[in-house]
Every structure is written in C-alpha cells, then in structure tokens.
Amino acid sequence: MSAAKENPCRKFQANIFNKSKCQNCFKPRESHLLNDEDLTQAKPIYGGWLLLAPDGTDFDNPVHRSRKWQRRFFILYEHGLLRYALDEMPTTLPQGTINMNQCTDVVDGEARTGQKFSLCILTPDKEHFIRAETKEIISGWLEMLMVYPRTNKQNQKKKRKVEPPTPQEPGPAKMAVTSSSGGSSGSSSSSSSSSIPSAEKVPTTKSTLWQEEMRAKDQPDGTSLSPVQSPSQSQPPAACTPRETGLDSKEDENILSGDRVDGGRKVRVESGYFSLEKAKQDLRAEEQLPPLLSPPSPSTPHSRRSQVIEKFEALDIEKAEHMETNMLILTTPSSDTRQGRSERRAIPRKRDFASETPTAPLSDACPLSPHRRAKSLDRRSTESSMTPDLLNFKKGWLTKQYEDGQWKKHWFVLADQSLRYYRDSVAEEAADLDGEINLSTCYDVTEYPVQRNYGFQIHTKEGEFTLSAMTSGIRRNWIQTIMKHVLPTSAPDVTSSLPEGKNKSTSFDTCLRPSEKQEAEPGEPDPEQKKSRARERRREGRSKTFDWAEFRPIQQALAQERASTVGSSDSGDPGCLEAEPGELERERARRREERRKRFGMLDTNDGPGMEDTALRMDIDRSPGLLGTPDLKTQNVHVEIEQRWHQVETTPLREEKQVPIAPLHLSLEDRSERLSTHELTSLLEKELEQSQKEASDLLEQNRLLQDQLRVALGREQSAREGYVLQATCERGFAAMEETHQKKIEDLQRQHQRELEKLREEKDRLLAEETAATISAIEAMKNAHREEMERELEKSQRSQISSINSDIEALRRQYLEELQSVQRELEVLSEQYSQKCLENAHLAQALEAERQALRQCQRENQELNAHNQELNNRLAAEITRLRTLLTREGGGESTGLPLTQGKDAYELEVLLRVKESEIQYLKQEISSLKDELQTALRDKKYASDKYKDIYTELSIAKAKADCDISRLKEQLKAATEALGEKSPEGTTVSGYDIMKSKSNPDFLKKDRSCVTRQLRNIRSKSVIEQVSWDN
C-alpha cells in the first residue's frame, strides 16, 4: 500500500467498463496529470499554426472586428488540453490552455467573426475563436476538435446515476481519428455496440504530417486501428502477410541505420509546421478491435511516452546546417528515408520496435491486449499517396532584385509550388504577402554573379528572378532546396532533343556562343534553346534581329561536300601512285611551285573549281587504264561525257555560298552592322580570290593535258615498240586532233558556263547584298525600337521621380507658407495688441492732459483767491494800524489792556494767514511737480509709442517680404506642375478699425484721474473753510 502511494499511477487509461476511471489504479481522471511535469509527459496528437482572437473580443461590436488576430502554435494533447504558445518549441511555456473535455460545441465562426476558415470553441467559461489560412487546415482541426463535444454529450447520456460528474472525460487519444487525406474520424462510444458517424474527408494538411508520421512509426505492421466502427459495420481486414511485415522491418532498419548522423546538435526549425515526415508509405486499413480483458504490458506505456517525449525533444536539439544535408537525400516511391531529423529517435524507436513487434498481429485471429487496444485508439489511419517532402519547406532572409535594378530585403518562405516573400516574419504571421514566385514552371536555378553578396537566379517560363544570399553556404542551401523541390516534377529533359553527336555533359546551358554554334551539327534546335536564345537577344536589345544561323546548315553542308571532294582529289589513284611514285611527286612539287608563283596574278579566264578538280583526278587515273588507240578514243569520249555530266550535276551556288558563309559568321560573331560599302568590298575580295582559284585550275588543266599526252606516248611506245613509227604517229595525230577538238569544245562550253556562272554570281551577290542590307535595316529598326522603349521607360521613371520631387517640394512650400501665415497672424495679433495699448496710452495721456489743465485752472483760481486774501489781509492790516494809531492818541491811557488783546488776536490771525499762504505755496509747488511728472510720462509714452510703431512696421515689412517670396515659390512650383497659380491668397492683417477696445482700461484711468482731482478739490475746500473759520 505504501509502495502504491509512493509510486502513483502516472498515466490515465480509461477502463473499458467505466470511462471515468483509470484501468490501472481505478482512480478518477482528475487525480492524474496534476502538475506541469506530468503535462509535459502527455502525448501530443495534433498541432499546427493558427490565428487566435484576442481575449475580450466582442465580434458584435464593429470596432472589435478590426482587431489583429494573434498567430500561435496550437498543440492538442491526449488528455484533452489544447495549448497554444508563441512558437513550436516544446520547451516554450504555453500562453493559454483550452480544456476540450469541458467543450460543449465547436461551430463555424465565419458568421460571427466575418473571417473565413474560423471556428468557435464553446466552453462553459468563455468562447474561443481560432482561424486558419486555408480550408484544409481548418477542416483538419474541426475534425479533431468535434470529437470532444460529441464524446462529452454521449458520456453525459451514458453515465451512471450513482457516479458523481467528473470534470474531465476521455480525450481524443482514446478516439479513432483518421488522417486528413482520406481517412474518416469519429468518437469513441461508452459501450462497444454504439458508433459515431465518421467525419467528413479532408485532404492532407501540413499541420498533421508530423502526427501522421508518429502514428506510422508507432505501428510496425503498417495499419491503423480504429474502434469507431460498430461490430455490425466493421469487416475483417486483410491479414498482414510476412512480406508486408518484412517490408516494414526493412524500412525501419533503414531509418534506424540512417538516423545516426548528427546526434546532440540543435537545429532551428525552418518551417512554420513540424518538419516531421512519414518514414514509410502507409496502407489504408481500418480494424475493429473487440473488447479483450488480457492484462497490459507494463513496459509499453513508458516506452511509448519516452518515445514521444524524445521525438519532441529532437526538434529542440537540431542545428541549422542540418537542412542543407537533408536537401541531398533522394526520395523513393516506397519510402521516404530521411536523415538528420530523427537521429535522436533512433534508440528509442529501436526499443519501441523491439517491444511492439512481438505483439503485432499477423492475421485477423491474433488476440490483442486491452493496453494494445488503448494504445491503438490514438492512431490515425494511414494514406497510400506520398506526402510532400517537408524538407523543402524553408524560410529565411534573402535580397531580391527588381526590374529597376534596386535590391530589397524580404523574408522568403518556400511553400508547395511557390516561393513567397514578406516584409518580415511578423508580416508572415499576419499573412501580409509582398509577392510570390511561381515554381511550377521553374526549370533551373543557377548561380548568378552580383555586385554584393552571393546571387542566384530562378529560371521560370515567366522569366528570371534574381536573388542574393548573405553567404555562399546559404545560397547553395537555397539552390539545393529549390532544385530538389522542382526537379522531380518540372525539370525539362534537355538531352532528349539534342543530336547524338553533341556532348551530353552540357545541361541547362542552351545559350551557345556563336563560335560554339558554328561547331554544332545541323538540325532542329531545342525549343528550350530557342527560348533561351530569344531571351539572350531580348536582354542584348536584339529581340527582332535577323537570325544568321538560318543560312548555316546549307553552308555547312556545302563546305563539308567541298572538303570531301578536295580530300578525295588529293588522295589520287592508288594504282597510279604505286606505278609512278617518284614522277608523281616531282609533278606535284612542280605544280605547287608554279601555283605559288601565280597566286598573286589575276586571270581573265575563270573556270569552275570543282569540275577542274574532278577532271584532274580522273585524268591522273587515266594513263594506267588505257590500252589500244581505239580504247583511248573511247575512253576520251567517255571522259568527255562524264565531264559533261559532272558540269550539269555540279551545284551552281557552291562557289557563291561558301565564301559568303564566313561573312555571315563574322557578322554574327562581331554583332556589328556593316555598311553597304564595306560589304561590297568584302564581296569583291571574295570574287578576286575565286578568279585566282579559277586561273590556277585552268593552268592545272593545261599541265594535266601535257602530262596526258606524254603518258599516252610513253604507254604506246612501251606496249607497241615494234609497230611502225608512221602508224603510231598517224594514230597519235588523229587522237590528238580529236582530243584537241574536244578540248576546244569543252573550253568554249566552259567559257559559256563561266559567263553564266558570273552572271549568276552577280545576281546572287546582289541578292545577298539586298538580304544583308534588309537584315541590317531590320537590326537597326529593332535596335531603334529597343532604344525608344528604353528611352520611354527611363523618361517615365524620370517623370515619375520628378513628379514625386515636385509634389514633395509643393507640400514643403505649402507647409512653409502655412507656418509663415501662422507667424504673420501671431505678429498681426501682437500688432493689434500693441496698437490697442497705444490707443489706451493715448487716451490715458489725453486724460492726464485734461487733468493737468484742470489743475492749472484750479491753480489759477487758487492764486486769484490767494491774491484776494492777501489783499484783504493787507487792507485789514492797514485798517487795524490806522485804527490803532487813531485810538492811540486819544485812548492811550484808558484802554491799554484792550489794545494789547486786540493786537494779540491780530497777530494770531496774521500767523494763520501766513501759514495758509505757505500751504497754498506748497500746494502750488506740488501741482507743478505733478505737472512735470505728467509731462515726463507723456514724453515716455510717446517714445514708447514710436518704438512699438517702428518695431511693428519692421515686422510687417518682413512678413510682407516672406509672403511675396513664398508666393513666387508657390507660383513657380505650380507652373512646373502645370497647374493654375492660386489666386486671391489672403493674408490676415491688422485692422485698427476692427480691433476691440478695452473700456475697462479707460474707465480705470478716468476713475484714477477723477479721484485725484476730487481729493485735491476736497483738500482745498477744507482748507478754505478752515481759513474762513
């Protein structure tokens, strides 16, 4: 019991009688796989890249529909958890988990999301929206995920009432899921008698290949076991023959032997999908497993789990250069032997193979254990068609050259039949495609020298695409990958249309140089060569030029015939050489010496070269064949007939066309356009050379005639030495006369033929000249058209660049104009404020002036009042003095006390008056000071007004200059663009009549001045009242 607690059951396996209990420990499912370590040991059964809607997205809200979906790598595990992470590495922590055991339904999400190929996973907690790029991928995911809601619904119906509801149900690892290329899928039933309808068939998707490979490798017998079918629907499958078992064993041995290349190295996964392939060709079969009760093998689950874990760890410990090694592996129809991708799987697979082979059934009657059945529930049925080689799926940074010669860096992704390129890897995740290269018509990938980096060209029927890589290794890797991708299906058979005599080592080099074309054998050129030549001429600006190679087969045939004829004539007759070798050598030496002497001379009598050469050959043979004089005469007639036949059958254009062939070849080799004068001079040189050859042949004819006479005489004397000399002389004279007549006839005929040949030569020369001129004209026209196209193209590009520059300048000028207008408005506003302040200052100055005038008036009034008081005081003093003098005489003794009192009062009154006068003087002086202060303020305000006015005038003048300058620039830009200059460009300025006044300021000034005046007046009135009192 303690051992059981220390070693709990680490893997849940559904009991065949109660699906919610484990068949090993009979504990509920929730007690298994509780921590992350257990979750990492779970077996993944499906995976791939999908797009996930962000959390909190409400697709009923139109604003949320424009949210960007997140690209994540989803992995569905056997325990029913659907996890998604940022990449496909098993060590990456998942960003979220969807518990498919609680899923209620998986429905199409296009109606809600507005996105194609989207699904909605409904759970009690929330809704999850996923989306794929293609219909095949989303169909495969729908097929896998639909198993869970069906299973959950059926388990809820079939549950026993005494059992408490469990939060998790058996995952799809316990269901039979067919491959997406042709198998059918369904959900497992709680009892063996029920079945679920199989899902819709979908084609193979990239995200399922790695899972199908693991299923194929887990089954050495090559079959997939599916419990979907009911006993009534299932049919007995074909028995596994020893031959099939041996084939699978051989294939596994190939994998085990070929997977020890790179152990312990880490590779970056080049593809967005798991780059795991099938190790062998699958066979379509489905088997129904009856419920068996035999105990399972305890070692098999651990080996299966360790195998899956090491398969996923293999993705994390491969190296980047491993992709290059995989490009060189050859694929066969029976197996896909792959090296390097599964080297870490070699030892676990050997252990797994050893543990499973004894239990593999060989016939339908072989019993299987319940553990075997449980293990078979998570396998998919295999397919018979070969899956695409995922090693060809490659991505990386390359630089592409565009038509204008500019290079731009892109993120390239190699897909099925296309090479797509994006702005970067983020754009690839968002499916933001920049362009695509169709590889279905690609027939070659070659290295191409470029100025920077390492370039290569992809040759397709649509054209050539120039790319470049950072290093030569990366370039070689890409070339091998693309070639391996396109060669098995679309590589053209270059050697099929070439002549047998041509060198077979030249493949994909169809554009021969002119010197190489001259050596090639005549025949119909390869269509690919024609296209390549056309492309070469198009690149060189000669797409419509005349092809001189059309004349070459006839010229080559004539040259070969002439060479063979001359060779045969030089060889001579063997009998003659044996008879008289020394004399023949001397004759030939003499002829060569005479020919060298006459080489520079021009003879008027021209003769056909081929006829004279053949005549010389036959005449050299004739001395050894003649016998009697009758035979000699007959032989002469026969030779004459033969010479006539030879003249009639000799092609007349041989002399004309053979010399012209070098002209054509030289024209094509140099690719120069000769003028008519140069062509005529060349033809004249060729004619002189032909005339020299004709004169040489005539001279050789005369020599041969002399030799013939000498030989005939020597032969006659040798054979008929005893014949009378007269008879010999008569016969010889008759024969010589006849022969001479024939020779004269032949010469006359030869002269007539020579005249005809000259006329024909002149006519053909004229025709060739006209043809050459027409060809040169065609070349000139083609070159002119090409130049016009290039010029038009360059003009268009220049105009577009100029338009863009002008548009940019116009935008810049408009922005500057707007900024100047804004500055002018600010200055105008400041000017308005200054003007308003000046107005306020002027009003304040005017108020000060009025107050000053009022003060002056009051001062005058006070002066008058003071003068009046002084006058009154003087009068009063005078009156008192007179009174005192008058009363002093009469009442000096009687009223001394009264007089003293009156004098004191008067003295006090006088002092008061003097103090009042003093106060008034002080007030007058203070008023004078205030007046001076007011005058100073006025002067300061006027100076400030002048400074502000001057500053504003300068600013306005500067703003006017800037506006006029910008108007001129804008006018020049609009004239350059061909538009009408803007009229009525208004600039807001300051209007003194429109400026708002500030009444509060005036009121404040007025109230201040009035308050001061009021204080002064009140003070003077109080003093006056006190003085009166």
UniProtKB/Swiss-Prot annotation:
Residues 179-195, 226-237 have a biased composition (Low complexity). Residues 492-509, 562-571 have a biased composition (Polar residues). InterPro entries: Actin_Cytoskeleton_Reg (IPR052223), M-RIP_PH (IPR039597), PH-like_dom_sf (IPR011993), PH_domain (IPR001849). Residues 43-150, 391-487 form the PH domain. Residues 1-387 are annotated as: Interaction with F-actin. It is found in: Cytoplasm, Cytoskeleton. Keywords: Actin-binding, Coiled coil, Cytoplasm, Cytoskeleton, Phosphoprotein, Repeat. Residues 828-883 are annotated as: Interaction with PPP1R12A. Residues 152-267, 279-306, 333-383, 490-614 are annotated as: Disordered. The modification Phosphoserine is found at residues 198, 224, 226, 230, 232, 271, 275, 294, 297, 369, 497, 622, 804, 981, 997, 1018, 1020. Residues 245-267, 338-354, 527-550, 583-592 have a biased composition (Basic and acidic residues). The modification Phosphothreonine is found at T300, T650. The keyword Cell inner membrane does not apply. The keyword Iron does not apply. Residues 550-828 are annotated as: Interaction with RHOA. One of its GO terms (molecular function) is actin filament binding. Binds RHOA, PPP1R12A/MBS and PPP1R12C/MBS85 through adjacent coiled coil domains. Interacts with MYZAP. Binds F-actin through its N-terminus. Targets myosin phosphatase to the actin cytoskeleton. Required for the regulation of the actin cytoskeleton by RhoA and ROCK1. Depletion leads to an increased number of stress fibers in smooth muscle cells through stabilization of actin fibers by phosphorylated myosin. Overexpression of MRIP as well as its F-actin-binding region leads to disassembly of stress fibers in neuronal cells. This is Myosin phosphatase Rho-interacting protein. It comes from Rattus norvegicus (Rat).
